Amino acid sequence: VGPSGVGKTTLLKVMCGLLSPTSGDVIADNLDIQKIGINNFRHGTACVLQEDRLFSGSLIDNISGFEDNADMDFIVECARRCNIHDEIMKMPMGYETIVGELGLGISGGQKQRILIARALYRKPSILFMDEATSHLDLKNESVINQSISGLSITRIIVAHRPSTIASADRIIDMSQLPMQAPA
């Protein structure tokens, strides 16, 4: 947590391997992610970032990441965990509904739940979330938090909403950390 501009998103992107640290190392499970290789590290992680988008394609494609022979049962399970399954079933073509630039318009909250379902489909051991539930009402956020907390996943969350912060086992207040000025 911390005020805007303190570096929460930047730190999260360094931790998930999207940005390289200017100094120091990123260690996960006692392994330096640079030494095991970013691609190897990313196989066990998933990210839901503020700027994430849905791709032009079906909801099946969007949740499975366009995986060949996507596991439909697991897609439905991920959607249920994200409290979006019932809404998908009400869409014109259910999971075959086309979304994205030319597809069905969906709300910001629906988009976030689909993006979280996509992340869960990867079966991550670490899930990085940057304001990933900011467009959700408290009920949907609570359902998702409870559902994910039942999984064996480490969540690293950037959030402003008190209920999201309260769901964490550990909280780091970045406004309390010494910051080094850019060189």
Where are these regions (language model features)?
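Walker A (P-loop) phosphate-binding loop of ABC-type ATPase nucleotide-binding domains
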Residues: P3-V6
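ABC-family ATPase nucleotide-binding domain "signature/switch" substructure
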Residues: T10, G44-A46, E51, L59-N62, ...
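Helix-to-loop junction immediately C-terminal to a conserved catalytic motif
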Residues: C16
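A position-specific signal in ABC ATPase nucleotide-binding domains
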Residues: L19-S20, I27, G37, T164-S167
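ABC ATPase NBD coupling module
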Residues: I33-A46
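ABC-type ATPase nucleotide-binding domains, specifically the catalytic core motifs of the NBD
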Residues: S64-D73
